[in-house]
Amino acid sequence: MMEGSRQTRVSRPYKISESSKVYRWADHSSTVLQRLNEQRLRGLFCDVVLVADEQRVPAHRNLLAVCSDYFNSMFTIGMREAFQKEVELIGASYIGLKAVVDFLYGGELVLDGGNIDYVLETAHLLQIWTVVDFCCEYLEQEVSEDNYLYLQELASIYSLKRLDAFIDGFILNHFGTLSFTPDFLQNVSMQKLCVYLSSSEVQRECEHDLLQAALQWLTQQPEREAHARQVLENIHFPLIPKNDLLHRVKPAVCSLLPKEANCEGFIEEAVRYHNNLAAQPVMQTKRTALRTNQERLLFVGGEVSERCLELSDDTCYLDAKSEQWVKETPLPARRSHHCVAVLGGFIFIAGGSFSRDNGGDAASNLLYRYDPRCKQWIKVASMNQRRVDFYLASIEDMLVAIGGRNENGALSSVETYSPKTDSWSYVAGLPRFTYGHAGTIYKDFVYISGGHDYQIGPYRKNLLCYDHRTDVWEERRPMTTARGWHSMCSLGDSIYSIGGSDDNIESMERFDVLGVEAYSPQCNQWTRVAPLLHANSESGVAVWEGRIYILGGYSWENTAFSKTVQVYDREADKWSRGVDLPKAIAGGSACVCALEPRPEDKKKKGKGKRHQDRGQ
């Protein structure tokens, strides 16, 4: 028995137990902090006094060093303050210092309109970033039309990127109101004004409003005229109607700005854009672009199941937030089994059938173009041949129409459309007649697969690749499954061939193909992936926000149209249901394109992004 130990009648085993357990005091940290605060308030064991505005705040060095990089450096790298009983903090206020120290000990920060800037100043000086973050959060909630410029100045002084970004968002969301106020016109810097005028998020009724705001700002002070070109280059002059450019904008710019400002060139550029209507898709610059960061999933035309409607002229897009399909400007004419392509931010609709009987006799050669900037359809040059059940590709600065059929039967011809000349030209044709095929673009190459001709028999497995630079078609490894009326698209490094249908070689009865396979152009290899949930012959297809969308379609086995939208997640290799189309429909087309935001979308208030500021 060891001396001083408690005597027992039974000798102690070598180990009382073989198990080991850890016990934790849940309130340990808060209790220690509470006791330290009690000691501080009673003046016990405090080894430093902080001085600001000739007023004193006692504290413990170890707690200050733990909570603040500023104090940690001061007390550990040999500075003289490490040995001083009192440390004067130049640049800190007593109001701010007391609030910050109270927070370090108690974990609560009281902020109001009277102390917020003092607390922010002190917390930034002492590098207590949690307090800085709370200050930014408070100020974000209190931003108003009365104080936003002062808060923007605070954000600049203390390099508060989070607060600065939030105030920028506030100004963008209220630009139509704020930009004409004296405070804004007098105090907003040229750099900030250019940020707002170049933003796709700026709130406005029309582009002319932004021009008026810019001209108002430029004419406030004579020295600002030197920055006229730098400011006005952010105005999207081509989005202003030509008549307004000539009769309102040009006179205003000429009267308000000196000729030396050299800004008339922007107007001349815009007029040239309007004068070359067909060539606009290949005349795109930052000033012709819509002010939006959001691309929409669109569905156009098709053959509907309701007999009274037959063909559709609807153009609608999916509003993901409301999970509803919203109507855009309708097609100039009802169409089904047409093709859609996007070039230069314009939507092109080519060919298709103008009758419910789409066997080829009702094929069209018309090409319509939709401008989302002015929400108008126009007719441009027609294809050389009428086409239905074909594929239309958009590549570089041209469209490529491939195969299909018309009143003369299946086609092998291929033609390209040049917006610059508004004309179609034949290029190398397909090696065989083909219709009911599908296609996609991958790295400037056109790929088509499957399809049929007028010969009796099953559909094809073929995969063809077209290089527009050499005008040559080449065979690639065929699909594992023959199919027609299917869909193709490119996502990541793969090309997907999706669903469709085929004819039974013995009975010649049509059956649905649900299988999906992915092609690797690098390996020239096909791989099976998750099959569709539902049949999809003659459906629309598009890739939107990293997922494949299959819209509507037809089931040959069930003889039924579909309103189902199927969505493929490549990472999970899984199909799921999306938002149903308004009607059951087949023979429609889908695409993804930026659209002019609706008025209610322009006025929605944005939210600032949260991130830690570190005074950088």
Swiss-Prot record:
Q: Does the keyword Repeat apply?
A: yes
Boundaries of each BACK domain copy? 148-250
Q: Provide ranges: composition bias, Basic residues.
A: 604-616
Where are the residues of the annotated region Disordered? 597-616
Q: Where is the BTB domain?
A: 46-113
Q: Which domain of life is it from?
A: Eukaryota
Q: Which SUPFAM superfamilies match?
A: Kelch motif (SSF117281), POZ domain (SSF54695)
Annotated Kelch repeat ranges: 296-345, 346-397, 398-444, 446-493, 494-546, 547-595
| Pathways involved | Protein modification; protein ubiquitination
The GO biological-process annotations, alphabetized, read as: protein ubiquitination
Keywords from UniProt, A to Z, are:
Kelch repeat, Repeat, Ubl conjugation pathway
What biological function has been recorded for the protein in this entry? Answer: Probable substrate-specific adapter of an E3 ubiquitin-protein ligase complex which mediates the ubiquitination and subsequent proteasomal degradation of target proteins.
Which protein is depicted? Kelch-like protein 36
Species this chain originates from: Homo sapiens
